Swiss-Prot record:
Extracellular side: 67-262
An example Gene Ontology biological process: cell adhesion
Annotated GO CC locations: external side of plasma membrane; plasma membrane
Gene3D superfamilies: Mannose-Binding Protein A, subunit A
Protein name: T-cell surface glycoprotein YE1/48
Length: 262
C-alpha cells in the first residue's frame, strides 16, 4: 500500500444543559462543613456555660439550704435551752417557796407551842407570896421563873428609885430585858398597870442605859422618847414608854437562875 492518508477526527460531546447545571458535591462540601463546625463550637460553649451556671446554682442552693438548716437548728436549740432554763428557774422558785412555806409553818407551830407553854407556865407558877420572906417588909410580890430567869413583880407602887431599892434589898435588880422575845413574853404576863423596869436616861452619857450599864440585844428606837416626858422606862402590855421617875408604879425585878447562890 502506497502512501495512505490518515485522517484524524476529534469527537466532542456537548453536555446537556441539565448536566451543565449539576454541581459537583466536592465543590460545596468545604463551606458547609466549615459552617457546621462553627455552629457546633458555639453550642458546645453554650452547653458548657449552662453546665457551669447550673453547677454554681446548685452549689449556692445547697449552701443556702445548709445555712437555713443550721439556723433552724441553732434557733431550736436556743429555744430549748431558754425553755429549759425557764423551767429550771421556775422549779427553783417553787422549791424555794415550798421551803420558805415549810419553815414558816414550823416557826408558826413553834411559836404557838411556845405561847401555850408560856401561858401554862405562867398560870401554873404564878404565886402570891409574903415578901417578908425576902425584904422584911409587907410588900406583895408575884414571882415566877421562866427559862434562865426569875421575875418578881412588886405590887406595892413605888417611884423608880424606890423600886430599885426594893429589888436590891432582895438581892435582885430592876429588870433588864435582854431581847425582843423576852419583851413579847413579858407583855403577856405583866399586870394591867404599867411597871418600872431597869432602863433610865444617863445624863452623863446623854443616852439611855440599862441598870447594869451593859448593852442589850433588844433594839430600841430611843430617839422617839422625849426626855422631857421622863427619864425612866415603863413596861405595859402594849409598849415600852418613858415616864417621870417620881411617879409611882409597880416594880419588876429580875435575876438569872445562874446568878442565884447554890
Amino acid at each position: 500500500m502506497s502512501e495512505q492518508e490518515v485522517t484524524y477526527s476529534m469527537v466532542r460531546f456537548h453536555k446537556s444543559a441539565g448536566l451543565q447545571k449539576q454541581v459537583r458535591p466536592e465543590e460545596t462540601k468545604g463551606p458547609r462543613e466549615a459552617g457546621y463546625r462553627r455552629c457546633s463550637f458555639h453550642w458546645k460553649f453554650i452547653v458548657i456555660a449552662l453546665g457551669i451556671f447550673c453547677f454554681l446554682l446548685l452549689v449556692a442552693v445547697s449552701v443556702l439550704a445548709i445555712k437555713i438548716f443550721q439556723y433552724d437548728q441553732q434557733k431550736n436549740c436556743e429555744e430549748f435551752l431558754n425553755h429549759h432554763n425557764n423551767c429550771s428557774n421556775m422549779q427553783s422558785d417553787i422549791n424555794l417557796k415550798d421551803e420558805m412555806l415549810k419553815n414558816k409553818s414550823i416557826e408558826c407551830d413553834l411559836l404557838e407551842s411556845l405561847n401555850r407553854d408560856q401561858n401554862r407556865l405562867y398560870n401554873k407558877t404564878k404565886t402570891v407570896l409574903d415578901s417578908l420572906q425576902h425584904t422584911g417588909r409587907g410588900d406583895k410580890v408575884y414571882w415566877f421563873c421562866y427559862g434562865m430567869k426569875c421575875y418578881y413583880f412588886v405590887m406595892d407602887r413605888k417611884t423608880w428609885s424606890g423600886c430599885k431599892q426594893a429589888c436590891q434589898s432582895s438581892s435582885l435588880s430592876l429588870l433588864k430585858i435582854d431581847d425582843e422575845d423576852e419583851l413579847k413574853f413579858l407583855q403577856l404576863v405583866v399586870p394591867s398597870d404599867s411597871c418600872w423596869v431597869g432602863l433610865s436616861y444617863d445624863n452623863k452619857k446623854k443616852d439611855w442605859a440599862w441598870i447594869d450599864n451593859r448593852p442589850s440585844k433588844l433594839a430600841l428606837n430611843t430617839g422617839k422618847y422625849n426626855i422631857r416626858d421622863g427619864g425612866c422606862m415603863l413596861l405595859s402590855k402594849t409598849r415600852l414608854d418613858n415616864g417621870n421617875c417620881d411617879q409611882v408604879f409597880i416594880c419588876i425585878c429580875g435575876k438569872r437562875l445562874d446568878k442565884f447562890p447554890h
